[in-house]
């Protein structure tokens, strides 16, 4: 209880009560003159302007006292809302006296707003809409929208002008005393002070009956002060504080990433969290992380206290707290028990997809760095060069259960974007397993036959055989669960020492892996078996060695194991694969030295030849046989070919036991272009403006670069750095917008019973397959049954899920088009149904009702965005080739902007009758004779044609190379064609960069892009012509009208 509660001090007016009222009690300023609210006057479109049907410029003149406005015409020739200058006003006043009324400032606007008869306006606008076209119609639709909103909500238009300004509670605009008696205060206090000062001055002036011009000036200043308070900088120059810094107004407090919503309401800093550098924890299991004792102590403090009191190790909470601060031995014992079975969440910024936060069980470690399991680094995109991660402790039982059941790292083996394992071994683990499964011909002990694995181990430990030695083993000694045939069991199996050890880590009943092929994942080939007594050494002398298991194959093994055994067995296999990989890579002793980079003897020859070709091209240019841009293109092509030739020769020269080659071949680190730069030539570089320079860097890093070459390569290096920084921000922003659009797409029901489907074929780019049919149909439901064209056998029934086996059989039957259920043709409102979505990529099972597929889709498209190349790549300003690629192209598609390097679409089906060039205005004219009419299209001279004279062309096809505008496709063809185009284009960009994304994610996004309909004819519905609305609402309105027997509306998708 507070003494003197509720008593108000008579000196300073402060009430005695609890301090928290300083966060809830508000004040207000009663204004001496009304002021307009800048949001309603300055917003786009201006709400005041729409209600009054006046231009924002006229309103500004009235509100800021530049012009008078007639508020009541009376019996004079003046009309309401007519603007008058100071001089005109004086002259008219002299002529008509008080027969008319005019005013200026927010007061006049308030009067005008109060005069608006909303009901009447609605009737008039609806009538106008029936006749109006073009801009007039657009304006009418906007006005009707806002006026109907006023009618529905019961708000009055004159309330857009304020007579009273509220003041937010004092604790939300704090003032703190600094040392030295100065004060630091929130900007809002400054802004409020300006309003109060001007308001008080205005009151005094009005009491004194000051001259009109002074009062007007004061009212304008009050209006400006109120504007600055609500949204500083929206109109005119912002009000600045000390050091010319614009003050943060109420709007700034809410707006953007640092505003109230995104900073404090959607994402808060939380207790029981920490952050530290991460380090690798090779000793951890798949679901564990190493937690430094010091951090554990703080994070689990309340749990430890409770346990200490419970075990009578501390008398009360305060004693327990002291014990923890002293780091007593009791505390350490309790800590071990407390963290058992208590999962924690680890997060690494930027969190681009849902695998950026996963749950682990903590294991106490010494030191100050958190230890992360090496296999989850890929999901987090983490490395150990100083990255930091945040840790959070779920407190409630529900939170812990959720973390355990849904978020444990061991359960996230497949990536949601493409359904491929995301926890595949990398780097050391890959090279270890690669080294282990390598075979070498003629190693010590080749052709020895052993009775079982233990004998092989003994022989290996005693150096009778090498890891790479090819040997034989009695098949009957291998585990009984292995799927060998009876015939194979009775024979000797041919394999290598390392492969025997590798197969030890696989599940008991998994096929014995002897060669990295898809077939071997299901059964082992008979050619690896010999009858007892056959000459094994002679056999080995004739058979070539088998390739080792590379990174991709290890991934395939994991995917196959996951498919058969699901989560638990897969995470155990992953841990065994990791341990084996680390052990073997340590034993292999792989290094990189200068001697691994060998000189290429053919290089001088290739370079000399390229120089000769360049000289020829230059000569042709000097004689005027070719243009400068053709010369440039040819030079670039010559050097690119020279570089490719050198690369090819390099690969031929590499020995299979060259350490660098092994690293790259296994997929552990590095690729061919790194080699070309080390041992071949660096090649062409891009100048800062993105144009490729004609002078290549001929040297490689083994020889060393000259000063000029070094200088050239700095351009490329700088561009690389800036691109990466820009790309990360761009990609993150794109993900945010995608999520925003798609977050309400959820799996709502089992089946929408749609009778439409999507015909899918392989996605091609010219003759190159970008996405094969197999990947497009896998995990989807068939809309129509598919039959084998030869045998007539049913491969898949209507509404049946296409599994790996079915997809394989469809491809083997030579079928090129399959009709599947798709998100495009789904009838479910506000979401998608299970049948139209198909398999959940992250689990490999059918998607469940309630899954937030929209968010998953947005993350799956946004997350690889950082891997896409930035910028458009200019090969020397040749117009035909300036087609956007990479991230900007993806943004261009999703925002439906007019594409750069646009391709013209034909609106008629017919024959190309002529292509005429007009050198004068640098254009080409293409004429197409359709069945009913002839069309002529004008293209730039530089456009690369896809059609020639006499070609037949179909409506909706492109005439020249480039990107079509989806907005044109939707007008010429239909929604489905547009959605299909979007999927194809996005896939092209991602697949070119080697990023795989499942179609269904792009389908979900494309469906959201085409969700709106523009009402063309409202029929007898309540819809307004020209309005944009959601397709579901449009259908509902039509269904209601049809039930009442009225005419339905017609609309056009946009």
Curated annotation (Swiss-Prot):
<dbReference type="Pfam" id="PF04983">
    <property type="entry name" value="RNA_pol_Rpb1_3"/>
</dbReference>
<feature type="binding site">
    <location>
        <position position="826"/>
    </location>
    <ligand>
        <name>Zn(2+)</name>
    </ligand>
</feature>
<keyword id="KW-0240">DNA-directed RNA polymerase</keyword>
<dbReference type="GO" id="GO:0003899">
    <property type="term" value="F:DNA-directed RNA polymerase activity"/>
</dbReference>
<keyword id="KW-0862">Zinc</keyword>
<dbReference type="InterPro" id="IPR007080">
    <property type="entry name" value="RNA_pol_Rpb1_1"/>
</dbReference>
<comment type="function">
    <text>DNA-dependent RNA polymerase catalyzes the transcription of DNA into RNA using the four ribonucleoside triphosphates as substrates.</text>
</comment>
<keyword id="KW-0808">Transferase</keyword>
<dbReference type="InterPro" id="IPR038120">
    <property type="entry name" value="Rpb1_funnel_sf"/>
</dbReference>
<keyword id="KW-0804">Transcription</keyword>
<dbReference type="Pfam" id="PF04998">
    <property type="entry name" value="RNA_pol_Rpb1_5"/>
</dbReference>
<feature type="binding site">
    <location>
        <position position="383"/>
    </location>
    <ligand>
        <name>Mg(2+)</name>
    </ligand>
</feature>
<keyword id="KW-0460">Magnesium</keyword>
<comment type="subunit">
    <text>The RNAP catalytic core consists of 2 alpha, 1 beta, 1 beta' and 1 omega subunit. When a sigma factor is associated with the core the holoenzyme is formed, which can initiate transcription.</text>
</comment>
<comment type="similarity">
    <text>Belongs to the RNA polymerase beta' chain family.</text>
</comment>
<feature type="binding site">
    <location>
        <position position="836"/>
    </location>
    <ligand>
        <name>Zn(2+)</name>
    </ligand>
</feature>
<dbReference type="GO" id="GO:0006351">
    <property type="term" value="P:DNA-templated transcription"/>
</dbReference>
<dbReference type="Pfam" id="PF05000">
    <property type="entry name" value="RNA_pol_Rpb1_4"/>
</dbReference>
<dbReference type="InterPro" id="IPR006592">
    <property type="entry name" value="RNA_pol_N"/>
</dbReference>
<dbReference type="InterPro" id="IPR012754">
    <property type="entry name" value="DNA-dir_RpoC_beta_prime_bact"/>
</dbReference>
<dbReference type="InterPro" id="IPR045867">
    <property type="entry name" value="DNA-dir_RpoC_beta_prime"/>
</dbReference>
<keyword id="KW-0479">Metal-binding</keyword>
<dbReference type="InterPro" id="IPR042102">
    <property type="entry name" value="RNA_pol_Rpb1_3_sf"/>
</dbReference>
<dbReference type="InterPro" id="IPR007081">
    <property type="entry name" value="RNA_pol_Rpb1_5"/>
</dbReference>
<feature type="binding site">
    <location>
        <position position="385"/>
    </location>
    <ligand>
        <name>Mg(2+)</name>
    </ligand>
</feature>
<feature type="binding site">
    <location>
        <position position="752"/>
    </location>
    <ligand>
        <name>Zn(2+)</name>
    </ligand>
</feature>
<protein>
    <recommendedName>
        <fullName>DNA-directed RNA polymerase subunit beta'</fullName>
        <ecNumber>2.7.7.6</ecNumber>
    </recommendedName>
</protein>
<dbReference type="InterPro" id="IPR000722">
    <property type="entry name" value="RNA_pol_asu"/>
</dbReference>
<dbReference type="InterPro" id="IPR044893">
    <property type="entry name" value="RNA_pol_Rpb1_clamp_domain"/>
</dbReference>
<dbReference type="InterPro" id="IPR007066">
    <property type="entry name" value="RNA_pol_Rpb1_3"/>
</dbReference>
<dbReference type="Pfam" id="PF00623">
    <property type="entry name" value="RNA_pol_Rpb1_2"/>
</dbReference>
<dbReference type="GO" id="GO:0000428">
    <property type="term" value="C:DNA-directed RNA polymerase complex"/>
</dbReference>
<dbReference type="GO" id="GO:0003677">
    <property type="term" value="F:DNA binding"/>
</dbReference>
<dbReference type="Pfam" id="PF04997">
    <property type="entry name" value="RNA_pol_Rpb1_1"/>
</dbReference>
<feature type="binding site">
    <location>
        <position position="387"/>
    </location>
    <ligand>
        <name>Mg(2+)</name>
    </ligand>
</feature>
<dbReference type="GO" id="GO:0046872">
    <property type="term" value="F:metal ion binding"/>
</dbReference>
<dbReference type="InterPro" id="IPR007083">
    <property type="entry name" value="RNA_pol_Rpb1_4"/>
</dbReference>
<feature type="binding site">
    <location>
        <position position="833"/>
    </location>
    <ligand>
        <name>Zn(2+)</name>
    </ligand>
</feature>
<keyword id="KW-0548">Nucleotidyltransferase</keyword>
């Amino acid at each position: 209880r507070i003494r003197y509660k509720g008593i108000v001090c008579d000196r300073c007016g402060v009430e005695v009560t609890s301090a928290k009222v300083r966060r809830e009690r508000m004040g207000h300023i009663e204004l001496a003159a009304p002021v307009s609210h800048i949001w309603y006057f300055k917003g786009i479109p201006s709400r005041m302007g729409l209600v009054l049907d006046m231009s924002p410029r006229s309103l500004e003149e009235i509100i800021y006292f530049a012009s008078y406005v007639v508020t009541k015409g009376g019996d004079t020739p003046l009309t309401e809302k007519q603007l008058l200058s100071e001089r005109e006003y004086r002259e008219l006043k002299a002529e008509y006296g008080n027969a008319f009324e005019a005013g200026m400032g927010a007061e006049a606007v308030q009067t005008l707003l109060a005069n608006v008869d909303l009901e009447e306006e609605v009737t008039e606008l609806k009538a106008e809409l029936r006749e109006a076209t073009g801009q007039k119609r657009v304006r009418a639709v906007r006005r009707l929208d806002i006026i109907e909103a006023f009618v529905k909500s019961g708000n009055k238009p004159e309330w857009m002008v304020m007579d009273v300004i509220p003041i937010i509670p004092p604790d939300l605009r704090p003032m703190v005393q600094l040392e030295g008696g100065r004060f630091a205060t929130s900007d809002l206090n400054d802004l409020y002070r300006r309003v109060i000062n001007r308001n008080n001055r205005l009151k005094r002036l009005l009491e004194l009956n000051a001259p009109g011009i002074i009062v007007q000036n004061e009212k304008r200043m009050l209006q400006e002060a109120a504007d600055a308070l609500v949204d500083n900088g929206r109109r005119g120059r912002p009000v600045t504080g000390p050091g010319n810094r614009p003050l943060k107004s109420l709007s700034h407090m809410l707006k953007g990433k640092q505003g109230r919503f995104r900073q404090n309401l959607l994402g808060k800093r939380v207790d029981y969290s920490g952050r530290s550098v991460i380090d690798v924890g090779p000793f951890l299991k798949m679901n564990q992380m190493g937690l430094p004792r010091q951090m554990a102590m703080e994070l689990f403090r309340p749990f430890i206290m409770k346990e200490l009191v419970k075990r009578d190790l501390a008398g009360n909470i305060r004693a327990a707290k002291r014990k923890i601060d002293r780091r007593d031995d009791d505390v350490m014992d309790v800590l071990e028990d407390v963290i058992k079975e208590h999962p924690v969440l680890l997060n690494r910024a930027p969190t681009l997809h849902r695998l950026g936060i996963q749950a682990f069980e903590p294991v106490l470690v010494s030191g100050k760095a958190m230890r992360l399991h090496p296999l989850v680094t890929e999901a987090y995109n983490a490395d150990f060069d100083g990255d930091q991660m945040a840790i959070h402790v779920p407190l409630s039982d529900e939170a812990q259960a959720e973390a355990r059941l849904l978020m444990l790292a061991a359960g996230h083996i497949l990536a949601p974007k493409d359904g491929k394992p995301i926890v595949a071994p990398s780097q050391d683990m890959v090279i270890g397993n690669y080294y282990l499964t390598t075979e070498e011909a003629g190693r010590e002990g080749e052709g020895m036959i052993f009775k079982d694995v233990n004998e092989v181990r003994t022989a290996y430990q005693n150096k009778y055989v090498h890891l790479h030695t090819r040997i034989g083993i009695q098949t009957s000694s291998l585990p009984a669960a292995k799927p060998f045939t009876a015939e194979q069991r009775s024979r000797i199996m041919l394999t290598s020492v390392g492969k025997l050890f590798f197969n030890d880590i696989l599940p008991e009943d998994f096929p014995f892996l002897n060669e990295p092929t898809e077939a071997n994942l299901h059964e082992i080939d008979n050619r690896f078996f010999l009858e007892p007594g056959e000459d094994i050494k002679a056999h080995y002398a004739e058979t070539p060695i088998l390739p080792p298991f590379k990174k991709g194959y290890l991934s395939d093994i994991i995917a196959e194991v996951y498919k058969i055994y699901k989560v638990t067995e897969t995470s155990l296999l992953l841990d065994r694969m990791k341990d084996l990989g680390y052990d073997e890579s340590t034993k292999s002793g792989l290094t990189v030295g200068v001697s691994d980079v060998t000189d290429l003897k053919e290089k001088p020859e290739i370079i000399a030849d390229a120089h000769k070709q360049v000289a020829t091209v230059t000569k042709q240019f000097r004689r005027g046989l070719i243009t400068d841009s053709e010369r440039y293109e040819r030079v670039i092509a010559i050097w690119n070919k020279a570089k490719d030739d050198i690369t090819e020769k390099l690969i031929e020269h590499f020995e299979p036991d060259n350490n660098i080659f092994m690293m790259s071949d296994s997929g552990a680190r590095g690729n061919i272009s790194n080699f070309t730069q080390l041992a071949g030539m660096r090649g062409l570089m891009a100048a800062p403006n993105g144009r490729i320079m004609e002078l290549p860097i001929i040297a490689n890093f083994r020889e060393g670069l000259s000063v000029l070459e070094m200088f050239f390569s700095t351009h490329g290096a700088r561009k690389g750095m800036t691109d990466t920084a820009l790309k990360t921000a761009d990609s993150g922003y794109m993900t945010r917008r995608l999520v925003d659009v798609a977050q309400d797409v959820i799996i709502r029901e089992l089946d929408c019973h749609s009778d439409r489907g999507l015909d899918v074929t392989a996605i091609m780019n010219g003759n190159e397959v970008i996405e094969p049919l197999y990947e497009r149909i896998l995990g989807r439901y068939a809309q129509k049954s598919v039959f084998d064209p030869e045998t007539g056998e049913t491969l898949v029934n209507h509404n049946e899920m296409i599994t790996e086996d079915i997809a394989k059989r469809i491809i083997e039957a030579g079928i090129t088009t399959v009709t599947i259920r798709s998100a495009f043709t789904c009838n479910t409102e506000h979401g998608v149904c299970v049948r139209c979505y198909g398999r959940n990529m992250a689990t490999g099972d059918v998607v469940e009702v309630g899954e937030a597929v929209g968010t998953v889709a947005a993350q799956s498209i946004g997350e690889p965005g950082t891997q896409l190349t930035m910028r458009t790549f200019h090969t020397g300003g040749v117009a035909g080739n300036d087609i956007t690629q990479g991230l900007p192209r993806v943004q261009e598609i999703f925002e439906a902007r007019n594409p750069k390097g646009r391709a013209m679409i034909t609106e008629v089906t017919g024959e190309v009758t002529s292509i005429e060039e007009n050198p004068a205005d640098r254009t080409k004219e293409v004429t197409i004779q359709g069945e009913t009419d002839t069309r002529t299209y004008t293209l730039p001279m530089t456009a690369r044609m896809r059609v020639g004279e006499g070609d037949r062309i179909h409506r909706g096809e492109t005439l020249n190379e480039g990107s079509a505008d989806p907005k044109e496709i939707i007008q010429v063809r239909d929604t489905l064609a547009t959605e299909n185009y979007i999927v194809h284009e996005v896939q092209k960009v991602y697949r070119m960069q080697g990023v795989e994304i499942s179609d269904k994610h792009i389908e979900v996004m494309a469906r959201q892009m085409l969700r709106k309909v523009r009402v063309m004819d409202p029929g007898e519905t309540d819809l307004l012509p020209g309005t944009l609305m959601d397709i579901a609402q449009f259908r509902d309105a039509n269904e209601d009208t049809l039930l009442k027997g009225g005419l339905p509306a017609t609309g056009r998708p946009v």
